[in-house]
Regions:
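SAM/dcSAM-binding transferase cores
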Residues: 2-39, 47-54, 220-273
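A generic structural signal for alpha->beta connector loops
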Residues: 100-102, 126-128, 180, 206-208, ...
């Protein structure tokens, strides 16, 4: 049950109108606290992000824990790009776990940025943690940099905007990846178009795609690989997970095993080619 609701309403000025809209509109960001958990809601009761107040870097929601699996696939990463801020849960995780990485987040909603900065313990004074107010579609299309990871988590009031699920967007994201870069996207599990979106990603990334549905929220996390992993062996990746689990406070192996179960390939390799 939502308690202690705090509401921040941001009227976007003409200067900051998101390029995908073209007129004035209100973007409402609600914040709730229940026991030791603070959550963000954008335009509806749906939880966009949650933070454990006593442990701000803990990944409270299971779908964000699934996202953390990207760490075992990354090869000497330097630059990570996130489209969609929310409460910055996964950004903060990678900021701490990958202590030499630069974290850049693109967020279109100024109210979401304001709430995240005030209430979700973002490392504001770090040179490695940057938030840019912009349209994620345009930013990725026009960016010159290459990224080791691009995570697309751009939900609006009623779900995932269609423009973030179209082939041109997936093509632009792949173009912005390093040679062994990873594209990750959070999809809405109840959306009947989700399977079509995954098929589009498979088309663009030549079937080098993994996905898993979270048990509590129904979110589907998709991992797409720009090229074949240098370390593609399941047994080696499991050893990486065991090492990682000794340093974090949640289990990863359970998610990895579920991903393997979804794979048609039953060999010791994630991908055969």
């Amino acid at each position: 049950m939502i308690s202690k609701i705090k509401k921040i309403i941001g009227l976007v000025s003409e200067k900051n109108i998101p390029k995908r809209e073209g007129e004035f509109f209100e973007m409402t960001v609600d914040m709730s606290e229940t026991n030791d958990v603070r959550s963000m809601h954008i335009g509806s009761p749906t939880i966009q992000s949650s933070m454990r107040i006593s442990d701000p870097y803990h990944l409270e929601l299971d779908y964000t824990q699934i996202m953390a699996l990207a760490a075992i696939f990354l090869e000497k990463p330097k630059d990570l790009l996130f489209v969609g801020l929310g409460g910055a849960a996964i950004q903060k995780f990678f900021y701490r776990w990958l202590s030499k990485c630069n974290i850049v987040t693109i967020e279109i909603n100024p109210s979401a940025i304001s709430v995240a900065k005030q209430f979700f313990k973002i490392p504001l004074n770090s040179k490695r943690f940057k938030i840019i107010q912009d349209d994620g579609i345009d930013y990725i299309k026009n960016a010159k940099e290459k990224y080791d990871l691009i995570l697309s988590d751009a939900f609006e009031e009623y779900g995932l905007p269609e423009v973030f699920c179209e082939i041109p967007y997936f093509e632009d994201c792949r173009e912005r990846l390093t040679e062994h870069g990873i594209f990750m996207i959070n999809l809405w599990g109840s959306d009947p178009r989700t399977s079509a979106y995954i098929d589009r990603i498979k088309l663009i990334f030549e079937d080098r795609v993994l996905h898993l549905k979270s048990t509590s929220s129904g979110n589907i996390i998709v991992f797409a690989f720009n090229s074949l992993l240098n370390e593609n062996r399941v047994d080696v990746l499991k050893r990486k997970i065991l090492t990682m689990e000794k340093q974090i406070d949640f289990e990863l192996m359970v998610y990895f095993n579920k991903i393997l179960k979804n794979q048609k390939n039953k060999t010791n390799y994630l991908f055969l080619s």
